[in-house]
Amino acid sequence: ATLTNPAGTPVTVTLSNGATITIDAGKTTGTVTVDAPKDDVYKDAGKVEVTIEGATGGNFENLVPSAVPAVTNVTDTIDTSTVKLSADTSVAEGGTVTYTATVGAPVTGSPVVVTLANGQTITIGVGQTTGTATAVAANDALTGNAPITNSITGVTGGNFEDLVADKTPVSTSVTDVPDTTTLSLSASNSVAEGGQITYTATLTNAAGSPVTVT
């Protein structure tokens, strides 16, 4: 803080950030040191503005604080925030797979929308670090099931300095639930002598490989 004339008595200057500066008698300047905003993962304003809220002392005839703010530009250090995907490790046929997207710090500004390879999206709300989506595992009558895989294809939103997606695939194994398949036989209701009878074998579920009926 700087005076245009030397102080007759100590001057106490109160700043808008809560700090105070003392200008000693006979002096025209005084200083105080404060910490710059701490590094974080969010986009910062880029500058710090402080004004004088009040000044007392000095024995001046008329002490008038300037309303012009003191401005300090703050260089933002870019930190990366990564969104990761996890999933249930196993599920039964017809069961529900839960996908969870996680980011390292609470979301600010706007929700983060995570797009998955299976076409679903997960929303991580403001103030949250996780969001979920569910999918149903297919249920069929065939033996064996391929694992269900999924991954993040993109992320948007939030107020992060650098938001990126961990696109490592996640996999969920599917446990067989035995389903009964019935094979039935039907025939032509009637036929003339010397004609042909048609026999039809019918499955209640589609065959995964050719079925020979004896």
Explain the meaning of each model-derived region.
Residues A1, G26, V34, V50, ...:
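Extracellular/surface recognition and adhesion modules
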Residues T4-P10, A105-P111, A206-V211:
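Extracellular acidic loop/turn motifs
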Residues S16-G18, K84-D88, N118-G119, S184-S188:
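Surface-exposed, proline-enriched loop/turn segments that connect beta strands in immunoglobulin-like
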Residues E53-T80, T153-T180:
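Terminal edge beta-strands and adjacent linker/stalk segments
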Residues T89-G95, N189-G195:
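Short, solvent-exposed loop/linker segments at the N-terminal edge
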